[in-house]
Amino acid sequence: MNKQAYYALAAALAKHFNQPLDSVLRGESFALKAPEAALLGENIQQRSDFLKQINMIQVAHTKGQKLFGATEKGVTGRKQTGRNLANLDHTQNGFELAETDSGIIVPWALFDSFAIFKDRLVELYSEYFQNQVALDILQIGWNGQSVADNTTKADLSDVNKGWLKLLQEQRAANFMTESTKSSGKITIFGDNADYANLDDLAFDLKQGLDFRHQNRNDLVFLVGADLVSKETKLIQQKHGLTPTEKAALGSHNLMGSFGGMNAITPPNFPARAAAVTTLKNLSVYTEAESVRRSLRNDEDKKGLVTSYYRQEGYVVEDLGLMTAIDHTKVKLNGEV
C-alpha cells in the first residue's frame, strides 16, 4: 500500500472534521457535529440525480412527527369568528430511525490506483465511497422490508423499511395487492388484463390519491424497467416497426408521460413496481448527532476500511399522496 497516500488521506479527513491526526491514524471513530453531518449528507445526495429531487434531512431525534406531514385539509379559507387554521393530520404515522452502518474495504491494490491521481486522491476516494452509500440508500428505500438486528439479505431488504413497505403498512388501501377482477394478482398488458397498458395503470393509481392531490402538476409515475420494456415491445409489435423505426422509438422518450404524469424509473426500483406520488413526498431522515466516521488500515484484510455510521430511516410524508402496486403480485401478458 502507498503509505504516503494513506497518510495524506487520513490528514485530509482529520483536517476536514477537525480531528486529531493520530486518532484518525489509529482508526478510531469520531462523531460529526451537526453541520458536518449535514454537509456529508448533502455530498452523498449529490451522487444521485434521484436523491437530489427528494428530501434528505437531518433531525434531532430518532422518533417523532414527520417534518412535512399532511394537514387535515387545505390550509386556506376564512372564518368570521377568528383565523382560518388547519391542523396537522395526527392520524398519520410518525417516523422512527434505525441503526445504519455503511462500511467498505478498499484493497491495497485498488487504493494504490487511486493514489496515482495524487492531488485528486481525496476527491476520488470520497466519491467512490459516497457513490456506494447513495446506491444503498436507494436500494433500501425501494426494497426495504424489515429492520433486522443482524442483517443478512443480499438485497438489503432487512436493513430498514423503505417507502413502498411503509405505504403498505401505514395506508394499506393505497397499496394494491390484487385487482378487482382477479384474486391474488395484478395482470398488466393485453385485452383481458386488469390494465391493458401502463397508461391505464397510471391513471388508476392517480385516482387512488386523496382527492385534493389528484390534479397536482408535480405528480410522477414511478415505473419499473420490466414494465417499460414490455410496453415498448408491444408498441413495436402493434405497429410492425422496421429495425430503423425501432431504433428511433428507442431514442425517443417513451417514458414521457403516462396518465398525464411524467414517468421515471428510479435507480434500484423493483422491475415490476409502479407508484404515483411527488418526489418531495419521499424523505430520508438522519439523526444529526448520531453520525460517526472512521478510516483505518486493516493489515489482516489487506485494505483500507471506511465506515459511516448513523441512525437513519425512510418517510412517506403524506400517505394520501402516494399509491403503489405490489410488484410481487404482478403478472404480465401470458403469464399464469
Curated annotation (Swiss-Prot):
The keyword Ribosomal protein does not apply. InterPro entries: Phage_P2_GpN. Assembles to form an icosahedral capsid. This is Major capsid protein. Belongs to the P2-like viruses major capsid protein family. It comes from Haemophilus phage HP1 (strain HP1c1). Keywords: Capsid protein, Virion. Pfam families: Phage_cap_P2. One of its GO terms (cellular component) is viral capsid. It is found in: Virion. NCBIfam families: major_capsid_P2. It comes from the Viruses. Coiled coil: none annotated.
